[in-house]
Swiss-Prot record:
InterPro entries: NA-bd_OB-fold, Ribosomal_uS12, Ribosomal_uS12_bac. Part of the 30S ribosomal subunit. It comes from Staurastrum punctulatum. GO terms for biological process: translation. Belongs to the universal ribosomal protein uS12 family. Residues 1-16 have a biased composition (Polar residues). Its main location: plastid. Pfam families: Ribosom_S12_S23 (PF00164). Residues 1-23 are annotated as: Disordered. This is Small ribosomal subunit protein uS12c. It is found in: Plastid, Chloroplast. One of its GO terms (cellular component) is chloroplast. One of its GO terms (molecular function) is rRNA binding. Keywords: Chloroplast, Plastid, Ribonucleoprotein, Ribosomal protein, RNA-binding, rRNA-binding.
Length: 123
């Protein structure tokens, strides 16, 4: 506990809140190029092959981003849009790829929650 005199000498500093997605540099999304597309396994107690991509962003960062939805067309050198948002059961994955923009096509045969997967309204 500081004395009154110590507080007069230098006041209390407010705690700075750190961003959860530093690679975006305070932008809503960033463009990037896939350097590697692969699958990885989640933490316990879950079991799956989650699709992820290593992405070099225009901000200079290289991050791991999750590819949402069933099936994708991404490969090395695909240009994609990355947004924030972590995947709870994949350690180190703090970004999502935006489907339906740039080289990432929307999810095929998607009927519900289409806006999250870049799918136009079916006729």
């Amino acid at each position: 506990m500081p004395t009154i005199q110590q507080l007069i000498r230098n006041s209390r500093q407010p705690a700075e809140n750190r961003t959860k997605s530093p690679a975006l540099r305070a932008c809503p999304q960033r463009r990037g190029v896939c350097t590697r597309v692969y699958t990885t396994t989640p933490k316990k107690p879950n079991s799956a092959l989650r699709k992820v991509a290593r992405v070099r962003l225009t901000s200079g960062f290289e991050v791991t981003a999750y590819i949402p939805g069933i099936g994708h067309n991404l490969q090395e050198h695909s240009v994609i849009l990355v947004r924030g948002g972590r995947v709870k059961d994949l350690p180190g994955v703090r970004y999502h790829i935006v489907r339906g923009t740039l080289d990432a096509v929307g999810v095929k045969d998607r009927r519900q929650g289409r806006s999250k997967y870049g799918v136009k309204r079916p006729k």
